Amino acid sequence: MNASNWSVYLILCENSAFYCGISPNPQQRLAIHTAGKGAKYTRVFKPVAMRIVAGGMDKGTALKQEIAVKKLTAAQKRQLWEQAEKMPSET
């Protein structure tokens, strides 16, 4: 596994809130969340869509970015969502 292939993603949940996470394989991680086997939050509030907000980084940098995104307000996360890269399943 390449050390620089980690991504930070946002998931739009059915309650219109955002869930933030990191993964070296966001498509696979979305499948896990959608199957109800991911984070507790996405088991309760099902994923609707996912977008990549940052990519091509090592795990440590991705973790720092994730923490920064989680500290954003809902409005700031919405703005980040609008600017983020759409997943192929969303086009």
UniProtKB/Swiss-Prot annotation:
Residues 4-83 form the GIY-YIG domain. Belongs to the UPF0213 family. This is UPF0213 protein NGO_1598.
